[in-house]
């Protein structure tokens, strides 16, 4: 709660990254040190745990709160509804773990309908992976372009279909009257 209050005062973005059991493989951690891989997703719970914070600061225009997780089961069930409801909440793409076309697709498919694309944080960089930043940005852009194009084409198709039904209804109404 204190971190959110301070973020509203200083304008810094608050980020929460639960859902990872770090350094799961003891031998790798012993040989190479901490944070060198072996991060395994674990179950997370946001809705109850963030309720007090979001009631206090979730509608505050001075706060931007980015939520991340490796726990894919929470994308649609908790994260997207929270981001769709609270103006301060943004969804962070779990690219550091699911840095693949399929991983990014699962994230977008499970969150876009409820939270929208505008409620996502975009592509944040991690300086620990400095050499891979360019490749990861390329992957994200190469994936996002067709995703947006397909979404636009699908939405346009729905609009044309709705317009056609409307026009057919008008013709039927005229024929009956």
What is the predicted function of each stretch?
Residues 1-74:
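Divalent metal-binding pocket/active-site signature
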Residues 15-19, 66-70, 91-95, 117-136:
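Short acidic/histidine-rich active-site segments
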Residues 24-33, 75-83, 101-109, 130-146:
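Histidine/acidic-residue-rich catalytic or RNA/ligand-binding cores of hydrolases
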Residues 28-33, 59, 87-90, 120-127, ...:
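Short acidic (Asp/Glu) and glycine-rich catalytic loops that position anionic groups and cofactors
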Residues 53-58, 73-94, 105-119:
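A long, glycine-enriched binding/interface module in the latter
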Residues 55, 60-63, 69, 79-82, ...:
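Acidic, glycine-enriched catalytic cores built around paired aspartates
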Residues 70-76, 91-109, 158-177:
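C-terminal helical cap
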Residues 117-118, 135-177:
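Mid-to-C-terminal alpha-helical segments outside catalytic/metal-binding sites
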């Amino acid at each position: 709660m204190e971190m959110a209050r301070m973020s509203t005062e200083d304008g810094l973005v608050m980020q929460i990254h639960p859902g990872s059991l770090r350094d799961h493989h003891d031998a790798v951690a012993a040989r190479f040190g901490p944070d060198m891989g072996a991060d395994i997703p674990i179950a997370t719970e946001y809705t109850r745990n963030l309720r007090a914070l979001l009631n206090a600061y979730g509608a505050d225009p001075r706060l931007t709160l980015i939520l991340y997780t490796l726990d894919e089961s929470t994308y649609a069930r908790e994260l997207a509804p929270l981001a769709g409801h609270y103006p301060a909440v943004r969804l962070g793409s779990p690219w550091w773990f699911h840095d693949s076309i399929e991983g990014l697709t699962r994230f977008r498919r499970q969150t876009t309908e409820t939270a929208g694309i505008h409620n996502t944080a975009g592509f944040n960089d991690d300086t620990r992976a400095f050499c891979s930043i360019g490749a990861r940005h390329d992957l994200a852009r190469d994936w996002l372009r067709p995703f947006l194009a397909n979404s636009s084409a699908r939405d346009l198709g729905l609009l044309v279909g709705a317009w056609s039904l409307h026009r057919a209804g008008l013709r039927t109404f005229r024929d009956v009257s």
